[in-house]
């Protein structure tokens, strides 16, 4: 094997927006990294579904296409 061709592999502190923190190893040049969703707050892992309504888009969709889904 050749020497000095591989990137540095060091610990990386990952912080989620929910407050969960964990340490992993990475070749990323940073010491810390922030993410929006982790396994502690992702709906797939928690079993809780969240609907994020941005500027009433869900209501607008329901007004426009709500009659298609009524039986």
UniProtKB/Swiss-Prot annotation:
One BP term from GO: translation
Protein residues bound to Zn(2+): 16, 18, 38, 41
Family annotation (InterPro entries): Ribosomal_bL28/bL31-like_sf, Ribosomal_bL31, Ribosomal_bL31_A, Ribosomal_bL31_sf
Example GO molecular function: structural constituent of ribosome
Cofactor(s) recorded in Swiss-Prot or TrEMBL: Zn(2+)
Keywords: Metal-binding, Ribonucleoprotein, Ribosomal protein, RNA-binding, rRNA-binding, Zinc
Cofactor: how and how many bound: Binds 1 zinc ion per subunit.
Transmembrane segments: none
GO CC annotations, alphabetized: ribonucleoprotein complex; ribosome
SUPFAM superfamilies reported for this sequence: L28p-like (SSF143800)
One Pfam entry name: Ribosomal_L31
Domain of life: Bacteria
Keyword GTP-binding: no
Keyword Metal-binding found: yes
Subunit-level organization: Part of the 50S ribosomal subunit.
HAMAP family referenced in this protein's UniProt entry, alphabetically: Ribosomal_bL31_1
Family: Belongs to the bacterial ribosomal protein bL31 family. Type A subfamily.
Role this protein plays: Binds the 23S rRNA.
Name assigned to this protein: Large ribosomal subunit protein bL31
Organism of provenance: Chromobacterium violaceum (strain ATCC 12472 / DSM 30191 / JCM 1249 / CCUG 213 / NBRC 12614 / NCIMB 9131 / NCTC 9757 / MK)
């Amino acid at each position: 094997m050749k020497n000095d061709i591989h990137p540095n592999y060091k610990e990386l502190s990952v912080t989620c927006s929910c407050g969960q923190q964990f340490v992993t190893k990475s070749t990323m040049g940073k010491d810390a990294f922030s993410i929006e969703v982790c396994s502690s707050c992702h709906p797939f892992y928690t079993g809780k579904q969240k609907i994020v309504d941005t500027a009433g888009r869900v209501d607008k969709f329901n007004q426009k296409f709500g009659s298609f889904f009524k039986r």
